[in-house]
UniProtKB/Swiss-Prot annotation:
It comes from Mycolicibacterium smegmatis (strain ATCC 700084 / mc(2)155). SUPFAM superfamilies: Ribosomal protein L16p/L10e. Residues 1-24 are annotated as: Disordered. Part of the 50S ribosomal subunit. PROSITE patterns: RIBOSOMAL_L16_1 (PS00586), RIBOSOMAL_L16_2 (PS00701). Residues 1-13 have a biased composition (Basic residues). This is Large ribosomal subunit protein uL16. GO terms for biological process: translation. Binds 23S rRNA and is also seen to make contacts with the A and possibly P site tRNAs.
Amino acid sequence: MLIPRKVKHRKQHHPEQRGIASGGTSVSFGDYGIQALEHAYITNRQIESARIAINRHIKRGGKVWINIFPDRPLTKKPAETRMGSGKGSPEWWVANVKPGRVLFELSYPDEKTARDALTRAIHKLPIKARIVTREEQF
């Protein structure tokens, strides 16, 4: 699982989900990529699930890059707890994703297999996304 090693503050405010991505909008490492089309919080478990889906489909001969990192904690209070008494404890680590951000990149010689692998990964993510190539832009 992807989690930060050390954080300055254990609990944070929720980041705003508005605007479009200013950086990381083009495929820079691989040949194909998954580009987000809407705002979302993507958890470390969802990132890991998508990575496993890609790796199982391509088997060997390809390389995968993960361009997002879950660096924000989301908190939750226990069930059946009265209101008040402070903020809940951190439960998940999430990455704040904006439209246009390239989440995963893949380098693989066969285009059809690469697109199938990325499609499987998109189904594991909680957002609408599309497959882009190195030549395409947002």
